Amino acid sequence: MDGFHATTIFAIRHNGAAAMAGDGQVTFGNAVVMKHTAKKVRRLFHGKVLAGFAGSVADAFTLFEMFEGKLEQFNGNLPRAAVELAKEWRSNKVLRRLEAMLIVMDGQHLLLVSGTGEVIEPDDGMLAIGSGGHYALAAGRALKQYAGASMTAKEIAKAALEIAADICVYTNGHIIVEEL
């Protein structure tokens, strides 16, 4: 039986600001929308870190808890916490089965964390994951390039998700944007 999945998360660093947006759709299998208003972008570590997930909901909550523990352990050092989470995620036989991806960001860093041990910081200050991630990333890049002078990070993040929601059937228009 298929699990709960599907979402789009987009994050951007732009003009000294940072924003992360996520839609609210939770899909069961390929045919049933179970929830429209899920909150997949969260503030962690005293509100100083944003984290968004795509993938299995239960797995993502497990990873959020683990990541928050790593942030506490390393006193908010985002790169170190992300690397340690990725190492544990990849090396533990039980955790290796978790099906989710995370985007995490603070005032200085924007990182993608995956269960294959990858911790990636983008060159262009933008990341997107999930079923509509490619659409959101393309939209975000276009918005930043052609309208970036007149748009904030929050506005670009929201618009990128709106465009992805118009294209991807697993992404809805109930968008939550968090800003640092």
From Swiss-Prot:
InterPro entries: ATP-dep_Prtase_HsIV_su, Ntn_hydrolases_N, Proteasome_sua/b, Proteasome_suB-type
Activity regulation remarks: Allosterically activated by HslU binding.
Catalytic reaction equation(s): ATP-dependent cleavage of peptide bonds with broad specificity
Subcellular location: Cytoplasm
GO biological process annotation, one example: proteolysis involved in protein catabolic process
GO cellular component, one term: HslUV protease complex
Keywords assigned by UniProt, alphabetized: Allosteric enzyme, Cytoplasm, Hydrolase, Metal-binding, Protease, Sodium, Threonine protease
Catalytic residues as annotated in Swiss-Prot or TrEMBL: 7
Class of enzymatic activity (EC top level): hydrolase
EC number: 3.4.25.2
NCBIfam families: ATP_dep_HslV, PRK05456.1
Quaternary organization: A double ring-shaped homohexamer of HslV is capped on each side by a ring-shaped HslU homohexamer. The assembly of the HslU/HslV complex is dependent on binding of ATP.
Homology family: Belongs to the peptidase T1B family. HslV subfamily.
Name of the protein described by the UniProt record: ATP-dependent protease subunit HslV
Gene this chain is encoded by: hslV
